[in-house]
Regions:
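Extended, low-polarity transmembrane helix blocks
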Residues: 1-88, 95-169
């Protein structure tokens, strides 16, 4: 019942607008700060590795192995991906364009930071991200999704609205 209300009601779309813009602002400003002030992820990754050792490690062994074997050797990629990812997730959420994709990729980053031992505001951002994701297209009803999603359905999937055209014999 709540999920249906979240996905179809215009009042919930208004509430989601406020939540979406707040979360988008947090993402966009974090990304913008990294883009304009310079960003090097290697110190963060080394700190994550340090948290994966010791008597009571904060970071799980498997995540530490991922950081050591993949993320740290590819720090140059992450130096671009993290700031641009944060900025674009924020922009998508604020504009309400490709909202569920933006929320999904925001959640991916939140969990990566969380697995790395960074608590800060990740739990509240994760909760908000899941609410937006659960709302589906209604999260972007008061935003670009209202026009972009029907356009994508029509042009990419050859569908108008919810009806599929059936092939003729």
């Amino acid at each position: 019942m709540f999920n249906r209300w979240l996905r179809t009601n215009k009042i919930s779309a208004g509430i989601l607008l406020v939540l979406r813009v707040w979360l988008g602002w947090k993402w966009m400003t974090a990304g913008w700060g990294k883009l304009t002030d310079g960003f090097d992820v290697s110190g963060y990754l080394k700190g994550t590795l340090a948290k994966a050792t010791g008597e009571k490690p904060v970071v799980q062994e498997w995540w530490g192995s991922f950081i050591e074997g993949f993320a740290l050797p590819n720090a140059g990629f992450f130096n671009l991906a993290i700031p641009w990812g944060e900025f674009l997730v924020g922009l998508g959420l604020i504009l309400g364009t490709l909202t569920t994709a933006a929320a999904f990729f925001g959640l991916m980053m939140n969990f990566a930071f969380f697995f790395s031992g960074t608590i800060s505001n990740n739990p509240e951002m994760i909760i908000c991200g899941f609410i937006i994701l659960a709302a589906g297209a209604n999260a972007g009803y008061f935003g670009g999704d209202r026009w972009v999603l029907p356009f994508i359905k029509e042009k990419l999937f050859n569908r108008k609205g919810q009806h599929r055209e059936t092939p003729t014999a």
